Design a protein with these regions (language model features):
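Domain-level signal for soluble alpha/beta catalytic cores
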Residues: 1-456
Length: 456
């Protein structure tokens, strides 16, 4: 029987509860207990929403007070020395100091660098790697949230950034550091301890996210991946280990990925449609489960369910249906909660939208179609097809006047580069390699003072 899962869920709250609670904590208007209570209420609401929608395996530890990569940094104790952390469990003040920087009379430390999470608009905090760095379990968040979910009867699937991707996403602080050498080895040791504890807690599946596998990887890097998972597999006990990829296809890494000693592989079948060709070309290992990411987790539009079902049926010719899990293509972190709450929007456009809650329903519908046949979901398929057709032909999408203007511009002759260059130089006066900023600067006391003095 085909089951369903998600890879992650929005965090901020339907009414931005997390934003308000965090800002109140930072301002000193409420304490840590109130912030933690808000987090617990949001987690419960998110788990219950997914269970009510019919999702079988529900992610846990996808929730974060700030950033999931920062949570991984705390888990392994990769706290830079400037925060004066002494190896104990990472507390909220240290956690937020890494996220936002800290300026006190006795301590002035900038935040960790922030950069884009692959090609999304989400930004993550960049781990800092040092020569001789040592790691140890320094946060109980992962285990606490698993226990929290289990107490509610949730079929919990713990989710972590995988150690291979975590090592690559970090930034070496000097040239001696080898991210896939001593750093990865240290991370694997701590992740092994974490897997031991999760297995003891009785979880069924453990999801390790390895999005770096959708980037080109060298033979040496894939060897490091293979060695890392050979070690991790010895710690999973009775739990099943899932390596989850997203944001594209895995390309030449497919065969190495498929051969890892794990129980499941997650592939993006939306932005990584080439993964379907890889499945057909190379097959899929017997006994393993495929998490088929078929509902787009990154956009706000309804899925064309008939087209998505055709892709799943194609995949099912390679992977037996009892070893298929239907899922979004990535975490639903990137979309809002509920499209039905959008009131100030054109009714036609609103009918094309699917936010997190609607995408849960789409995942469940596709799972049901594979289990019971197309006839069982005929009404859903028809409504989806009608919405897709309407959107494809709507004047909201296709404006004849714009098309005509663009056609005229394409027909106009453009001046040769040799003529445009001196005109641009005269008007703009830019150097050969102009630079700019994206508007983000470290929030040190000196920067804050300078900015305040310039406001007039």
């Amino acid at each position: 029987m085909v089951q369903t899962t998600t890879l992650g869920y929005p965090r901020i709250g339907r009414d931005r509860e997390l934003k308000r609670a965090s800002e109140a904590y930072w301002a000193g208007a409420q304490g840590a207990d109130a912030l933690r209570a808000t987090g617990a209420a949001l987690r419960r609401a998110h788990w219950e929403a997914q269970r009510a929608a019919g999702i079988d395996l529900i992610p846990v530890n996808d929730f974060s007070l700030y950033d999931h990569v920062l949570d991984a940094i705390a888990l392994v104790g990769a706290v830079p020395a400037r925060y004066r952390w002494h190896g104990e469990l990472v507390d909220l003040d240290t956690y937020f100091a890494m996220a936002r920087g800290v300026q006190r009379a006795d301590l002035d430390a900038p935040a960790l660098e922030m950069t884009k999470w692959f090609d999304t608009n989400y930004h993550y905090l960049v781990p800092e790697w040092h020569a001789g760095q040592r790691f140890h379990l320094a946060s109980t968040k992962l285990f606490d949230e698993v226990a929290e979910a289990q107490a509610l009867g949730i079929v919990a699937k713990p989710v972590l950034v995988g150690p291979f991707s975590l090592a690559l996403l970090g930034k070496p602080q000097d040239e001696r550091v080898q991210p896939l050498g001593e750093i990865l080895a240290g991370l694997v040791a701590v992740y092994g301890e974490a897997l031991d504890r999760l297995a003891e807690a009785g979880v069924g599946w453990i999801q390790l996210d390895e999005p770096c596998l959708v980037q080109d990887r060298t033979a040496e890097e894939l060897t490091a991946l293979r060695d890392a998972y050979a070690a991790l597999a010895t710690h999973k006990g009775q739990a099943k280990l899932l390596v989850q990829t997203y944001f594209g296809h895995v390309g030449e890494s497919y065969e190495t990925l498929a051969a890892l000693p794990v129980d499941g592989i997650g592939l993006d079948l939306v932005r990584g449609r080439e993964n379907l060709a890889l499945l057909r070309r190379h097959g899929f290992p017997a006994g393993k489960t495929l998490v088929a990411g078929i509902v787009d987790g990154r956009n706000v539009w309804r899925t064309d369910l008939a087209a998505a079902l055709a892709v799943l049926e194609d995949a099912a010719t390679v992977v037996p249906r009892e070893r298929l899990l239907v899922a979004p293509s990535c975490s639903l972190l990137h979309v809002p909660y509920d499209a039905t709450r959008e009131e100030g929007i054109d009714a036609e456009v609103r009918g094309w939208l699917a936010f997190a809650e609607q995408k849960l329903a789409e995942v469940v519908t596709l799972g049901r179609a594979l289990n019971e046949g197309r006839a069982a979901v005929a009404a859903d398929l028809a409504a989806s097809t009608a919405a897709a057709t309407e959107r494809a032909t709507s004047p909201h999408v296709h404006d004849g006047a714009v098309r005509e203007r663009l056609a005229q511009e394409r027909m106009s002759a453009r001046a040769p580069y040799a003529e445009r260059r001196p005109l641009q130089d005269a008007r703009l006066g830019l150097p050969p390699l102009p630079t700019t900023t994206i508007g983000s600067f470290p929030q040190t006391a000196e920067v804050r003072k300078t900015r305040a003095s310039s406001k007039g």
